[in-house]
Amino acid sequence: MIFHRIFFLFCVLSAGLASGGVSLSDVAHPAATAAAQLLQSRLGDAVGARFVLSSRADAADGYSVSRADGVYVITAGRPRGFLYAAGEPELWRDVGATPFVRKAPFKTRLLMYGKSVHSVAEWIAATGANAVQLSGSGTSEQVAACHAADVEAYAFLYGCDPMKWGASACEAYLAAHPTARGVDPGRSWEKGVMCPSDPATAAFFRAKIRALATAANADGVVVTLWDTFGLYCQCTRCKKSGLNQFAAEIAVCVKWFEEALKPLGKKLIVRTWSSGAPHFLRDEWVHAPGYASADEAIATWGQAFAASDPKTVFQTKVYNADCQPNPPFSLLLGRAKGRTEFAEWQIAGQTVGLQWLPASVVDHTAATMRRAAKLVGADGGVALYTGGYNCSGYEALDDIANSVNVYAWRRLSWNPDEDVDAIWRDWATKVYGAKAGAKVAAALRLSERATAASFSPLGLGAPTESRFAGSVSRREDLLRYTNRQYLPEGKAALAPTRENVARVVAEKDAALAQTDEMLRLVKDAAPQMDAAQAQELLLRIGWLRTHLVVSRALDGALWRLRYLRAEGQLGRTDEKVFGEIERDFETVRRESPNLFKHDADLKSSGYCGAVGDREILLRSPLPLMRDIESEARKVVERFAGPAGAKNGKISP
């Protein structure tokens, strides 16, 4: 076999020399140039490297590193392989004559890329991705940057409600094509803006995705049909043909997109995500098809799987809900037989404090990556969505607490069986140095369980915006949001008993003990780390502790209210429990001003600029606490009168 090799000479220096650096004499691809710059910035003068681009098929999407006579030789099957090597030098810098070999276990690793101070090349180096999802159509410059990094670029179409794409354009089209107007079901989050039975609707959708794909000449399009669904038409034609049902509407919409993109040679990735569990949002019912029960997922998507082009990719969240932390695993992933599937992770600050709180998801990522690998296989893919969730300016790669989540995803997406201890050690050493790293890693590992307890009591749900719910009814909807309500453990956790009140409180107390240990470990490590890093970590762990104190009172009071309701249905009440709710109210009133209390000039590693320049959008816990107290008072007074809450008696 003839191997075609192009040599990129970045210097012939001993790795131990203290002068010189990585210099560039001849480069044939910008990805190699970017990799050289990253190596220089990360390894400085202590490296000499020769890059070799090889066309060997067995090195198509990976790299290898060897070292002889003090010179590193990095071999890659494609130019992006050099970026992958530059993103994790801690894994190969001590290599000898026996090469360090890195091969990707998934054919595709998709990354969502938006506004960032870091370039596409830097993100590719950090995540090991080989495809990028842009916002909307992206720009020509962004697509060019992706191609310069030797990765594919995908446009993104959000939802299938034409009114949300552009109300004026939609109304004008419907005025010209009145038969395309749908019949709305009423009081539904999913709308019937256009009629899927009408040919003019199909033409509109084909034109939309065609324009999106060609605007910046992306390589393909990622589409998601929710949160804004506009094809839920209930007209006579749709009822007769069955196109008034979600499964049929999804299948026909995917078909339109395929018909538009195939002649252009563009690829299609369809996200199967919906909106958590079915629930009321204000006065509208969110159907969230596919999540109401264990067998509904395939019933919703099976028709689209079967009818789709074999080249269409289906991308499914590893979570069986649109929330974190620690939701149950997807019921749909691995069931699109004969189709390529991607597993998706959203490490976007949802329900973990919008990335302000320290919130590891490393253990969950490891468990789900290993499970997903068996379901999607080597020809499948993985996808990563990062961010602060409605908080602009968040830089996931710079966050000294939560960048470990991106780092772990990268390591696990290249080796699902990677040792989690090694991931933590390597990340903490990079960020904090060897002396402080071990203690900081031990501290931040505890945040995964602590944040889960603070936001998701007894494994039940929380709002995807991390906010405190404003009412009892909304909070109880959200308790079911992770879809455990139909599982035995979920039903048991929701039971209105004193035992469950005790379980909620005990879970919070254990988490508070974990945050105390986090604080102790960071204080012990502080003398060996940068003072600003120590200050930021101690502040953010303190925020988490205060959040736990408040959530202990809120969730304890809510479960007490549920107990009082159940007692009321039996014709009795327990005034002592109301007294406990009153004490919870005092705790929330006292501690709520301390939530996210900070020096306005403090700089945050994850968010650009001073913390005081940002609004931490978690809202106040007081409205929910007032509503709990008010409902509990009504229940007690029904049996014991206005003074009954104070006399400490149990009324029959």
What does each model-identified segment do?
Residues 1-7:
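Bacterial N-terminal signal peptides that target proteins for export
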